[in-house]
Amino acid sequence: QPTVMRFCRSIGVQGLADFKLKLASGLTGGAITVAHCHVEISDSDAELARKVLGNNASAALALRDMLDVKALTAAIELLRGAQRVELLAVGSARVVADDMQQKLLNLGIVSSFFADPQAQEMSAAMLKPGDVALVISRSGALPELLRTVKVAQGCGARVLAITASGSPLAKLADVLLTLNHPEGNLNFVPMIVRLLQLMMLDILSVGLARRDTAQRTSAAELEEGQLHGMRISGKLKFGGHLE
């Protein structure tokens, strides 16, 4: 019995009964999922690592299975046709927004992101019809972010939101990519939602990158030429953001 229980836990199931259920699901065409486990203070380092990695894998599989493909297609087309993309995010989502802006620039898409919420609102006020506000938020309920989104909409920009379903931000969005995931019960548990946001943006980036190959290649060559010149002149000491 102890050996069986250790095996079950190692593959992310709660016990023999849970393993049989997951196995039966796999044999009937379903997928054996990775169970979500809460991190406890009493956990060993090995248990901590297993749970964190297992939770990340579980969240990624859930995103794959519940992704709204129609909304994804609409989001890719919206970004492809945008004259300018303004990224809006606060808190930990700012890191995600900054990463996406770099991706958009690499794809030759005019984009901007300001970490300061007031600067975001000022920049949103300069948007025009044909522009897109890409908004990233776990809760979709922060007042300052919602205010900035309304400013962008008032200027004629369309809103693409990556946030929780049913949130105030979700209700404002022209196109919504839903991310719902409960966080752990400890402050030091990594934010799985942030990883899901990054994965969602990776999906969008790949969707954009598979088209307009000539434009993408031209932008990449231009950037590489600029970085090479900066390296030669000694102005770039730590390489570009692609390195």
Regions found by a protein language model. Name each.
Residues A214-E243:
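A short, charged, Gly/Pro-tolerant segment at domain boundaries
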